[in-house]
Swiss-Prot record:
The active site is at 235 (acyl-ester intermediate), 327 (charge relay system), 359 (charge relay system). Changing residue 235 to A: Loss of activity. Optimum temperature is 35-45 degrees Celsius. Optimum pH is 6.5-7.5. The keyword Chloroplast applies. It catalyses: 6-tuliposide A = tulipalin A + D-glucose. 6-tuliposide A and tuliposide A-converting enzyme, which are compartmentalized in the vacuoles and plastids respectively, come into contact with each other for the enzyme reaction releasing toxic tulipalin A upon cell disruption by pathogen infection or herbivore predation. Its EC number is 4.2.99.22. The lineage of its organism: Eukaryota, Viridiplantae, Streptophyta, Embryophyta, Tracheophyta. Expressed in roots, stems, leaves, petals, stamens and pistils, but not in bulb scales. GO terms for molecular function: hydrolase activity; lyase activity. It is an enzyme of class 4 (lyase). This is Tuliposide A-converting enzyme 1, chloroplastic.
Length: 385
């Protein structure tokens, strides 16, 4: 039985399903095996780890309450011994329907000390955003550029509260002086695509709605400069950034920063040619996230495939594409940039490549020379410099 047919045979919200709130980055092997979490910076601190069935998840203490681990279904059953799909180090799916996530399940609570908070934007789906507001005490009326951010994780892991994302975006907000809205979208396989895309589009539209009409969120209403809306995301979030920018209304988005984008294709290119195991892994991962997909040349995962919508339709004035030389996906990012430039798109585009580093390296090493250079470049882009 295929993975898609297995899930379609289960009843709605089967025993053991979660709400899709655990995740992490992208490619599973070698340089994209995924980062170890460094001690949180400007964030709540981890106090212990719990190990269960080989899955290690950190538990955080906020005042006197503990944040539950989202990595495992509530109670294992006898059927948990039978594995339907093994996608370690990301996740394992058991015949019972239980999903065990190994990465990206830790959640750091929003911390008032650094002006962050979580807001549910759709009670029906549970989709929320985490906002990051830089210090505006001295300039309470100052308007800030608004950065809408989409996290990575192959559409199956990670969340806005993960230490890597929380710490990185806290640092970026402080250094760049931007108001960041990070979208906590639903995950596959519990919520197959296009759920993630729909949630991110809804989050983007929620932000834009503050430019006119009743104020929904005071931080955005008081401090957001809606003439300076920017999008960014890494890995799967880079994929989503492209998706949203292709579907937004013209004139709304100032610029997009696409970081180490999760794009694939049926024909191996670059680093992929000598790594068939990674290709096989990502083919399985993509089909898990998008069971109705056309395959690796689906325009959702391969925006430069024959028949894909022209990149001339990207709805922004400026774009920067970041790639990493040791990234399995590096050639896909280059191909996207080249296709954008040749498409007839009328904006300004730039490709930034960092050698000797792998997929989303900047999320686990904030102080390294290359990470600092990358953030400096990103900040300059956000400021229009």
């Amino acid at each position: 039985m295929s993975v898609a047919s297995f899930f379609s045979s289960l009843p709605a919200r089967p025993f053991g399903y979660k709400d899709g709130r655990g995740r992490t980055g992208m490619v599973p092997t070698t340089d994209i095996g995924r980062r170890m979490v460094k001690p949180p910076v400007l964030a709540c601190r981890p106090i212990e780890s719990n190990t269960y069935h080989g899955s290690v998840t950190s538990v955080f203490l906020t005042k006197s309450s503990r944040s539950p681990s989202p990595s495992l279904s509530p109670t294992p059953t006898a059927l948990d011994d039978e594995i339907v799909l093994d996608l370690k180090p990301f996740l394992i799916i058991y015949k019972s329907g239980r999903i065990e996530r190994f990465l990206g399940t830790t959640v750091i609570p929003a911390c008032p000390e650094v002006a962050t908070k979580d807001v549910v934007i759709d009670p029906a789906t549970g989709v929320s955003v985490r906002l990051y507001l830089p210090n505006v005490v001295d300039l309470p009326s100052k308007k800030l550029p608004v950065l809408v951010y989409f996290h990575g994780g192959g559409f199956v892991i990670e969340n806005t509260g993960s230490p890597n994302y929380h710490n990185y975006l806290t640092l970026l907000a402080a250094k760049a002086g931007v108001l960041i809205v990070s979208i906590n979208y639903r995950l596959a396989p519990e919520y197959p695509l296009p759920a993630s895309y729909d949630d991110c589009m809804a989050g983007f539209n929620w932000v834009v709605s503050h430019s006119a009409g009743p104020a929904l969120e005071p931080w955005l209403a008081q401090h957001g400069d809606f003439s300076q809306i920017l999008l960014s995301g890494d890995s799967a979030g880079g994929n989503v950034t492209h998706y949203v920018a292709m579907r937004a209304d013209a004139g709304v988005i100032e610029g997009v920063a696409i970081v180490h984008p999760y794009f694939l294709g049926s024909e191996p290119v670059g680093n992929e040619i000598n790594d068939p195991a990674n290709i096989e892994f990502h083919d399985k991962l993509w089909r898990l996230a998008a069971p109705d997909t056309e395959g690796l040349d689906d325009p959702l995962i391969n925006p430069v495939a024959p028949g894909a919508p022209s990149l001339a339709g990207l709805k922004c004035k400026r774009a920067v594409v970041f790639v990493a030389g040791n990234d399995f996906l590096v050639e896909r990012g280059r191909m996207y940039y080249e296709a954008l430039v040749k498409s007839g798109w009328r904006g300004e585009a730039e490709l930034v490549q960092h050698e000797g580093v792998g997929h989303v390296f900047h999320l686990s090493d904030y102080s390294g020379d290359i990470s600092v250079a990358m953030m400096t470049k990103l900040i300059a882009f956000l400021k229009g410099e």
